[in-house]
Amino acid sequence: MKKKILILSGGISKERLISLDTGFQVAKELKKNGYKIKISEPDNNLEKNIKEFKPSVIFNALHGQFGEDGYIQTILEQYQIPYTHSGPIASSIAMDKEISKKIFINNKINTPKFIKYSFDKKSAKLIEQINDKLKFPVVVKPINEGSSVNVYICTKKNITKILKSMESYKEVMIEEFIAGREIQVAIMGNKKLGAIELKPKRKFYDYDAKYNTNAKTQHIIPVEISRNKLNEVMNMALKAHKVIACRGVSRSDFKFYRNKFYLLEINTQPGMTKLSLVPEIAAYKGISFIKLIEWILKDASTKR
């Protein structure tokens, strides 16, 4: 008899629509294969839904704040029901770009230089700081956000205006801009699944390039790179997965410039939409969408 799966999707983050799509795609595939499914929001009805449905596994399809930052994971561990993806600590670390980058640096994983900018401690010498430590252009991004939400490439001319528009975040990361190729690597368990290159039509692989079917981002698999370099970037992704203590699947985002890889961030709950990269990499490796989902479910546990 097939298991009963409760799928958590939606939420209140800016990635709500992506989460709903991920939940829908996973539910659709599982239903086709005979599983009993219930989709639930992470709201006040969650406990009621869990008690009434009595799921064998909870599939966490949430993205963004409260979904992949350790918050919901802490709640799920109290139910003593196996759930998918990374646990509270790994999720909170990966979601915090400042902490995760410091861990990368401490473990000799190459990552772009950065400074943290707090709006309650505004620096009159910000331009000097950037010129001294980073150089323009720079990338400005929220410290705790995913899917390239509110990520901007800034010049000396527009950075003040961009920062003004982001004051609701309280603090942001200002990172050196790395030109070059976009390489994404998927890890499955503690094994290297594969890599894919992205060629967006715009300057970088932003939210629109990721989820808009009209954005015409080119996906290249296999990556056109030497075997040694491919192994190098996949080893970096696996190392990042391990030092952050990720569980299940993860996806690491890299830039490749002047023969060097730069790890931008690691994603503990990569999307499962029709445009998502982990299912695409898995399919290239001969793992169907349902087999990928079933592996994630089998990997679930009560303590992550």
Regions found by a protein language model. Give the residues of each.
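Conserved metal-phosphate-binding beta-hairpin within the catalytic cores
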Residues: 176, 185-187, 241-274, 282
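Hydrophobic beta-strand scaffold residues
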Residues: 37, 82-83, 111, 138, ...
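Anion (oxyanion) recognition and catalysis
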Residues: 31, 77, 105, 132, ...
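ATP-binding N-terminal substructure of ATP-dependent carboxylate-amine bond-forming enzymes
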Residues: 1-95, 99, 118-126, 299-304
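Active-site "cap" helix and flanking loop/linker of ATP-utilizing ligase/carboxylase catalytic domains
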Residues: 197-250, 280-304
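Phosphate-binding site of ATP-dependent enzymes
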Residues: 155-232, 256-262
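Active-site nucleotide/adenylate-binding loops and adjacent lid/helix of ATP-dependent enzymes
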Residues: 2-9, 93-181
